[in-house]
Amino acid sequence: MIKREFLPESAELKIKLTADSKKWAEFYQKAEQKQAAKVSLRGFRKGKVPLEKARAYLNPQAVFELALRMFLPELEKQAATNIIDSDNVIESPIFNIVNMDKNNLEIEFLYPVYPEIKLPDYKNLKTKFAIKKITKEDIELQKQKLLEAKGRFIEVNRPVKIGDVINFNFKGFIDDEPFDGGEGENFDLRIGSNSFIAGFEEQLVGLEIKKEADIYVTFPENYQVHTYANKKARFRVRINKIKENQPAKLTNEFVASLKIQNVETISQLEVYLENLTERENIERAKIDFQRNALTEIGEQVEVPLAKKLINLEIERLNEVFHSTLKQQEIPLKEYLKITKFTEKDIYDQFEVEAKKLLKNSFIFAEIAKLEGLVPTQQEYESHVEKLAKFTGKSVQEISETVSYNEIQINITNQKVIDKLIEFNHEAKDEEIVNKNQNDNEIEQDKEQKDNNEEKIKQENNLENK
């Protein structure tokens, strides 16, 4: 007997089977015989103990599990014949045993299906795509960063200022007790880089070489070591060295030395930096819009998620996590010791993140379906070429290592964001949005611009270290 049932609250198709009792009995007997062959009794050669005598030594649970494992492929195939296209099944099933004894087996397969989603009015979001207006101060800041990156650091004997690179020792205390990971010696820090928790670097300003001082901070609520979150801490610090930056001089000769195509004078550099800043502002606006728009939509929609999909996503996140630890040569035990996490804490985090990622992926998919957003072959090939250029691999290598489906999803998701921007942007950004919708015209001459901008960004990154 076969029974189908759609479970909208968990986005699953349940197919319940009552197995043929004769077949199940045959598989059970085969499992008994296989398990009996492992039994050793005095007076019998191994594997030659009669089944009647071996039964007393068998683990019934092991017999049932083996019988089910042998029968399962046939049962799953039988269940699959009862799936139709309109069910929108998107993954292989998990199964539950309803009833199982020597003579009877009832089993249900739970197939993940595309969930029922009722989206809010995503064409009229409160979140708006807005691009920050470029000011003269922005251009001056870009120039200053570039000059500082090309400058040099010299040791000075004066109190610490914003922008200095200091070498210092520190030791942290919570409730007047030292804590793991709270101590360091000869640590280099760029003041103003916000590398430490809020309030730490600001209190270093004004300190002098070889003098000790206490700094008081509160760990943030989302601090990676959760046992320290929201805790007040005191750091005893000692400044060893102070270096200040002497920026390069802005001259036409300096500009020419940057070797940026068609940029040889100060005025040309300013125009170039203005274009660079505009592009950075657009990308930053896209990132902010995507995050806030998805949050707004997500708060107004429930997306049922099948257990199988959640488990698969947790497995993927776990694989990435362990791969990252391996690359950084950090044993799991050491990581747990440093962060004060348990393996259950990590699993719980993965579960929350998995549900969030799956929910967002279905929101993307539903909007793409409603708006008819389908990647073209040209878009696919262009995306592969960009990935190849970015990673330094050949187009063939990218095609072989990154799945077609993964690339299609990436392209579709970007088309969804572009469509949401088209629906939800401020009037002042109309021209830029229109360009973006016309094959991303804002990326004209992109290859040369990317090369030039990468030089600037690398210089600015050096300045921030």
Swiss-Prot record:
What this protein is called in its record is Trigger factor
Write out the biased-composition intervals (Basic and acidic residues). Answer: 443-465
The organism encoding this protein is Mesomycoplasma hyopneumoniae (strain J / ATCC 25934 / NCTC 10110) (Mycoplasma hyopneumoniae)
Q: Which reaction does it catalyse?
A: [protein]-peptidylproline (omega=180) = [protein]-peptidylproline (omega=0)
List the lineage, top down: Bacteria, Bacillati, Mycoplasmatota, Mycoplasmoidales, Metamycoplasmataceae
GO BP annotation list: cell division; protein folding; protein transport
Q: What is its main location?
A: cytoplasm
Please give the Gene Ontology molecular function terms for this protein. peptidyl-prolyl cis-trans isomerase activity
Main EC class the enzyme belongs to: isomerase
**Domain remarks in the Swiss-Prot or TrEMBL record:** Consists of 3 domains; the N-terminus binds the ribosome, the middle domain has PPIase activity, while the C-terminus has intrinsic chaperone activity on its own.
Has UniProt tagged this entry with the keyword Cell cycle? yes
Question: Domain PPIase FKBP-type, which positions?
Answer: 163-248
Role: Involved in protein export. Acts as a chaperone by maintaining the newly synthesized protein in an open conformation. Functions as a peptidyl-prolyl cis-trans isomerase.
Q: Which keywords accompany this UniProt record?
A: Cell cycle, Cell division, Chaperone, Cytoplasm, Isomerase, Rotamase
- Cellular compartments annotated: Cytoplasm
